[in-house]
Amino acid sequence: MTKADTIFKENITKIMEEGVWSEQARPKYKDGTTANSKYITGSFAEYDLSKGEFPITTLRPIAIKSAIKEVFWIYQDQTNSLDVLEDKYNVHYWNDWEVEGVPANNGDKRSIGQRYGAVVKKHDIINRLLAQLEANPWNRRNVISLWDYEAFEETAGLQPCAFQTMFDVRRVGEDVYLDGTLTQRSNDMLVAHHINAMQYVALQMMIAKHFGWKVGKFFYFINNLHIYDNQFEQAEELLKRQPSDCQPRLVLNVPDETNFFDIKPEDFELVDYDPVKPQLKFDLAI
Protein backbone atom coordinates (compact mmCIF):
# COMPACT_ATOMS: atom_id res chain seq x y z
CA MET A 1 0.00 0.00 0.00
CA THR A 2 1.39 3.39 -0.98
CA LYS A 3 1.43 6.38 1.33
CA ALA A 4 -1.24 7.96 -0.87
CA ASP A 5 -3.50 4.91 -0.46
CA THR A 6 -3.11 5.01 3.32
CA ILE A 7 -3.95 8.72 3.47
CA PHE A 8 -6.89 8.23 1.07
CA LYS A 9 -8.48 5.52 3.21
CA GLU A 10 -7.84 7.45 6.42
CA ASN A 11 -9.48 10.57 4.99
CA ILE A 12 -12.50 8.67 3.67
CA THR A 13 -13.00 7.00 7.05
CA LYS A 14 -12.63 10.26 8.94
CA ILE A 15 -15.10 12.09 6.71
CA MET A 16 -17.69 9.30 6.88
CA GLU A 17 -17.36 8.83 10.65
CA GLU A 18 -16.52 12.30 11.95
CA GLY A 19 -17.53 14.66 9.16
CA VAL A 20 -20.30 17.22 9.57
CA TRP A 21 -23.01 18.07 7.05
CA SER A 22 -22.77 21.08 4.78
CA GLU A 23 -25.30 23.89 5.20
CA GLN A 24 -26.50 26.40 2.60
CA ALA A 25 -24.47 24.50 -0.01
CA ARG A 26 -23.81 26.30 -3.30
CA PRO A 27 -23.14 23.33 -5.67
CA LYS A 28 -25.93 21.62 -7.59
CA TYR A 29 -26.21 18.28 -9.32
CA LYS A 30 -27.19 18.28 -12.98
CA ASP A 31 -30.83 17.65 -12.05
CA GLY A 32 -30.85 20.92 -10.10
CA THR A 33 -30.92 19.44 -6.61
CA THR A 34 -28.56 20.73 -3.94
CA ALA A 35 -25.27 18.87 -3.66
CA ASN A 36 -24.78 18.43 0.06
CA SER A 37 -21.67 16.84 1.51
CA LYS A 38 -20.02 15.58 4.67
CA TYR A 39 -16.75 17.35 5.35
CA ILE A 40 -13.78 17.79 7.63
CA THR A 41 -11.54 20.84 7.93
CA GLY A 42 -7.79 21.31 8.09
CA SER A 43 -6.57 18.28 6.14
CA PHE A 44 -2.79 18.08 5.66
CA ALA A 45 -0.50 15.59 3.93
CA GLU A 46 3.23 15.48 3.20
CA TYR A 47 4.94 13.53 0.44
CA ASP A 48 8.67 13.21 -0.15
CA LEU A 49 8.85 13.08 -3.93
CA SER A 50 12.60 12.53 -3.80
CA LYS A 51 11.91 9.20 -2.08
CA GLY A 52 9.25 8.11 -4.57
CA GLU A 53 6.20 9.18 -2.55
CA PHE A 54 3.64 10.53 -5.02
CA PRO A 55 0.08 11.66 -4.15
CA ILE A 56 -1.81 9.29 -6.44
CA THR A 57 -3.97 6.41 -5.27
CA THR A 58 -3.96 2.91 -6.71
CA LEU A 59 -7.52 2.25 -5.48
CA ARG A 60 -9.06 3.56 -8.71
CA PRO A 61 -7.74 4.88 -12.03
CA ILE A 62 -6.86 8.58 -12.06
CA ALA A 63 -7.01 10.53 -15.34
CA ILE A 64 -3.52 11.92 -14.98
CA LYS A 65 -2.94 12.90 -18.63
CA SER A 66 -5.88 15.29 -18.86
CA ALA A 67 -5.09 16.62 -15.39
CA ILE A 68 -1.57 17.58 -16.42
CA LYS A 69 -2.85 19.19 -19.62
CA GLU A 70 -4.91 21.51 -17.44
CA VAL A 71 -1.70 22.71 -15.77
CA PHE A 72 -0.31 23.69 -19.18
CA TRP A 73 -3.55 25.48 -20.04
CA ILE A 74 -3.32 27.56 -16.86
CA TYR A 75 0.41 28.19 -16.50
CA GLN A 76 1.81 28.04 -20.05
CA ASP A 77 -1.08 29.21 -22.22
CA GLN A 78 -2.24 31.46 -19.37
CA THR A 79 -5.78 31.66 -20.62
CA ASN A 80 -9.33 31.03 -19.48
CA SER A 81 -10.40 29.97 -22.98
CA LEU A 82 -12.41 26.78 -23.19
CA ASP A 83 -11.65 26.69 -26.91
CA VAL A 84 -7.92 26.38 -26.19
CA LEU A 85 -8.56 23.67 -23.60
CA GLU A 86 -10.66 21.67 -26.06
CA ASP A 87 -8.86 22.30 -29.35
CA LYS A 88 -5.28 22.07 -28.09
CA TYR A 89 -5.64 19.50 -25.31
CA ASN A 90 -8.94 17.68 -25.98
CA VAL A 91 -10.07 18.32 -22.41
CA HIS A 92 -13.79 18.98 -21.98
CA TYR A 93 -14.73 18.71 -18.30
CA TRP A 94 -14.45 22.46 -17.68
CA ASN A 95 -17.42 23.02 -20.01
CA ASP A 96 -19.76 22.64 -17.04
CA TRP A 97 -18.26 25.84 -15.61
CA GLU A 98 -18.56 27.98 -18.75
CA VAL A 99 -19.63 31.56 -18.06
CA GLU A 100 -21.89 32.52 -20.93
CA GLY A 101 -21.34 35.88 -22.55
CA VAL A 102 -17.87 36.39 -21.06
CA PRO A 103 -15.11 36.22 -23.69
CA ALA A 104 -11.73 34.71 -22.91
CA ASN A 105 -8.65 36.84 -22.29
CA ASN A 106 -7.29 35.82 -25.73
CA GLY A 107 -10.45 36.92 -27.55
CA ASP A 108 -12.11 33.50 -27.84
CA LYS A 109 -15.84 33.43 -27.21
CA ARG A 110 -16.03 30.73 -24.54
CA SER A 111 -14.47 31.10 -21.09
CA ILE A 112 -14.70 30.19 -17.41
CA GLY A 113 -14.70 33.87 -16.46
CA GLN A 114 -11.68 35.81 -15.23
CA ARG A 115 -10.17 32.87 -13.38
CA TYR A 116 -7.09 30.64 -13.28
CA GLY A 117 -5.03 31.23 -16.45
CA ALA A 118 -6.48 34.70 -16.96
CA VAL A 119 -5.23 35.70 -13.51
CA VAL A 120 -1.81 34.14 -14.19
CA LYS A 121 -1.56 36.22 -17.38
CA LYS A 122 -2.90 39.38 -15.78
CA HIS A 123 -0.19 39.43 -13.11
CA ASP A 124 2.56 37.77 -15.21
CA ILE A 125 2.88 35.31 -12.34
CA ILE A 126 5.08 32.62 -13.89
CA ASN A 127 7.65 34.99 -15.37
CA ARG A 128 7.87 36.86 -12.07
CA LEU A 129 8.24 33.63 -10.11
CA LEU A 130 10.99 32.29 -12.36
CA ALA A 131 12.81 35.63 -12.31
CA GLN A 132 12.93 35.87 -8.55
CA LEU A 133 14.01 32.24 -8.20
CA GLU A 134 16.78 32.99 -10.69
CA ALA A 135 17.85 36.09 -8.76
CA ASN A 136 17.76 34.41 -5.33
CA PRO A 137 16.70 30.76 -5.09
CA TRP A 138 16.60 30.98 -1.28
CA ASN A 139 14.16 33.86 -1.07
CA ARG A 140 10.98 33.13 0.90
CA ARG A 141 8.51 34.93 -1.34
CA ASN A 142 7.85 32.36 -4.06
CA VAL A 143 4.07 32.49 -4.04
CA ILE A 144 1.49 31.87 -6.75
CA SER A 145 -1.89 33.26 -5.72
CA LEU A 146 -4.97 32.91 -7.92
CA TRP A 147 -7.24 34.57 -5.34
CA ASP A 148 -8.04 37.84 -7.11
CA TYR A 149 -10.97 39.80 -5.65
CA GLU A 150 -10.91 42.23 -8.56
CA ALA A 151 -11.37 39.34 -10.99
CA PHE A 152 -14.22 37.96 -8.88
CA GLU A 153 -16.03 41.28 -9.15
CA GLU A 154 -15.28 41.60 -12.86
CA THR A 155 -17.05 38.40 -13.96
CA ALA A 156 -18.92 35.42 -12.64
CA GLY A 157 -17.15 32.05 -12.51
CA LEU A 158 -16.06 29.33 -10.15
CA GLN A 159 -13.66 30.74 -7.61
CA PRO A 160 -10.39 28.79 -7.68
CA CYS A 161 -10.25 25.70 -5.48
CA ALA A 162 -6.49 25.16 -5.66
CA PHE A 163 -5.66 28.83 -5.23
CA GLN A 164 -2.21 29.16 -3.71
CA THR A 165 1.15 27.49 -4.29
CA MET A 166 4.43 28.25 -2.52
CA PHE A 167 7.93 27.07 -3.30
CA ASP A 168 11.13 26.80 -1.28
CA VAL A 169 14.65 25.72 -2.19
CA ARG A 170 16.85 23.50 0.02
CA ARG A 171 20.46 22.45 -0.38
CA VAL A 172 21.30 19.00 0.96
CA GLY A 173 24.94 18.16 0.40
CA GLU A 174 25.64 18.76 -3.27
CA ASP A 175 21.97 18.57 -4.29
CA VAL A 176 19.45 21.39 -4.54
CA TYR A 177 15.79 20.51 -3.99
CA LEU A 178 12.60 22.42 -4.78
CA ASP A 179 9.78 21.91 -2.28
CA GLY A 180 6.17 22.85 -3.03
CA THR A 181 3.11 23.63 -0.92
CA LEU A 182 -0.42 23.59 -2.35
CA THR A 183 -3.22 25.29 -0.44
CA GLN A 184 -6.76 24.45 -1.47
CA ARG A 185 -9.96 25.97 -0.11
CA SER A 186 -12.19 23.05 -1.11
CA ASN A 187 -11.66 19.54 -2.45
CA ASP A 188 -13.95 16.76 -3.67
CA MET A 189 -12.09 13.90 -1.97
CA LEU A 190 -13.14 10.99 -4.16
CA VAL A 191 -13.05 12.73 -7.55
CA ALA A 192 -10.44 15.47 -7.47
CA HIS A 193 -8.06 14.87 -4.55
CA HIS A 194 -5.29 13.07 -6.42
CA ILE A 195 -5.93 14.98 -9.65
CA ASN A 196 -5.25 18.32 -7.96
CA ALA A 197 -2.26 17.02 -6.03
CA MET A 198 -0.60 15.49 -9.07
CA GLN A 199 -1.27 18.61 -11.14
CA TYR A 200 0.76 20.71 -8.76
CA VAL A 201 3.45 18.07 -8.40
CA ALA A 202 3.77 18.37 -12.19
CA LEU A 203 4.06 22.16 -11.91
CA GLN A 204 6.70 21.74 -9.20
CA MET A 205 8.63 19.36 -11.46
CA MET A 206 8.49 21.82 -14.38
CA ILE A 207 9.92 24.63 -12.27
CA ALA A 208 12.61 22.37 -10.83
CA LYS A 209 13.62 21.24 -14.32
CA HIS A 210 13.84 24.84 -15.49
CA PHE A 211 16.66 25.38 -12.99
CA GLY A 212 18.16 21.89 -13.02
CA TRP A 213 17.09 21.18 -9.43
CA LYS A 214 15.71 17.99 -7.94
CA VAL A 215 12.12 17.75 -6.71
CA GLY A 216 11.89 17.54 -2.95
CA LYS A 217 8.83 17.50 -0.73
CA PHE A 218 5.20 18.25 -1.59
CA PHE A 219 2.93 19.60 1.15
CA TYR A 220 -0.84 19.58 0.63
CA PHE A 221 -3.28 21.56 2.80
CA ILE A 222 -7.04 21.49 2.23
CA ASN A 223 -9.37 23.70 4.22
CA ASN A 224 -12.62 21.83 3.43
CA LEU A 225 -12.27 18.18 2.39
CA HIS A 226 -15.60 16.60 1.51
CA ILE A 227 -17.54 13.66 0.10
CA TYR A 228 -20.84 14.45 -1.62
CA ASP A 229 -24.01 12.70 -0.54
CA ASN A 230 -24.31 10.84 -3.85
CA GLN A 231 -20.84 9.31 -3.40
CA PHE A 232 -21.24 7.32 -0.19
CA GLU A 233 -21.53 3.97 -1.98
CA GLN A 234 -18.35 4.68 -3.91
CA ALA A 235 -16.64 5.65 -0.65
CA GLU A 236 -17.54 2.31 0.91
CA GLU A 237 -16.33 0.48 -2.19
CA LEU A 238 -12.98 2.26 -2.04
CA LEU A 239 -12.56 1.32 1.61
CA LYS A 240 -13.14 -2.34 0.72
CA ARG A 241 -10.64 -2.41 -2.12
CA GLN A 242 -7.17 -3.81 -1.64
CA PRO A 243 -4.56 -1.49 -3.17
CA SER A 244 -2.30 -2.52 -5.98
CA ASP A 245 1.29 -3.37 -5.06
CA CYS A 246 2.67 -0.92 -7.62
CA GLN A 247 4.64 2.20 -6.65
CA PRO A 248 3.56 4.88 -9.15
CA ARG A 249 5.78 7.85 -9.80
CA LEU A 250 5.68 10.74 -12.22
CA VAL A 251 8.71 11.28 -14.47
CA LEU A 252 9.52 14.38 -16.52
CA ASN A 253 11.58 13.23 -19.50
CA VAL A 254 13.44 16.40 -20.46
CA PRO A 255 17.03 17.49 -19.76
CA ASP A 256 17.84 19.64 -16.75
CA GLU A 257 17.48 23.38 -17.38
CA THR A 258 14.85 22.88 -20.08
CA ASN A 259 12.94 26.15 -20.28
CA PHE A 260 9.62 26.04 -18.45
CA PHE A 261 7.72 27.10 -21.57
CA ASP A 262 9.37 24.45 -23.76
CA ILE A 263 8.10 21.53 -21.69
CA LYS A 264 5.12 19.64 -23.19
CA PRO A 265 2.43 17.44 -21.63
CA GLU A 266 3.78 14.38 -23.45
CA ASP A 267 7.12 14.85 -21.67
CA PHE A 268 5.47 13.51 -18.52
CA GLU A 269 5.23 9.78 -17.91
CA LEU A 270 3.46 7.99 -15.07
CA VAL A 271 5.39 4.78 -14.49
CA ASP A 272 4.61 1.65 -12.46
CA TYR A 273 0.92 2.57 -12.28
CA ASP A 274 -1.52 -0.33 -12.21
CA PRO A 275 -4.66 0.88 -10.39
CA VAL A 276 -7.51 -1.29 -9.18
CA LYS A 277 -10.42 -1.59 -11.62
CA PRO A 278 -13.19 -1.17 -12.58
CA GLN A 279 -13.37 2.59 -12.60
CA LEU A 280 -16.06 4.13 -10.42
CA LYS A 281 -18.65 6.55 -11.80
CA PHE A 282 -19.42 9.90 -10.19
CA ASP A 283 -22.10 12.50 -10.92
CA LEU A 284 -20.30 15.79 -10.42
CA ALA A 285 -21.50 18.69 -8.32
CA ILE A 286 -21.37 21.94 -10.31
UniProtKB/Swiss-Prot annotation:
It catalyses: dUMP + (6R)-5,10-methylene-5,6,7,8-tetrahydrofolate = 7,8-dihydrofolate + dTMP. It is found in: Cytoplasm. GO terms for molecular function: thymidylate synthase activity. GO terms for cellular component: cytosol. It is an enzyme of class 2 (transferase). (6R)-5,10-methylene-5,6,7,8-tetrahydrofolate binds at D188, A285. The active site is at C161 (nucleophile). Pfam families: Thymidylat_synt. SUPFAM superfamilies: Thymidylate synthase/dCMP hydroxymethylase. Its EC number is 2.1.1.45. The keyword Signal does not apply. The keyword Transferase applies. Belongs to the thymidylate synthase family. Bacterial-type ThyA subfamily. Catalyzes the reductive methylation of 2'-deoxyuridine-5'-monophosphate (dUMP) to 2'-deoxythymidine-5'-monophosphate (dTMP) while utilizing 5,10-methylenetetrahydrofolate (mTHF) as the methyl donor and reductant in the reaction, yielding dihydrofolate (DHF) as a by-product. This enzymatic reaction provides an intracellular de novo source of dTMP, an essential precursor for DNA biosynthesis. This is Thymidylate synthase. It comes from Streptococcus thermophilus (strain ATCC BAA-250 / LMG 18311).
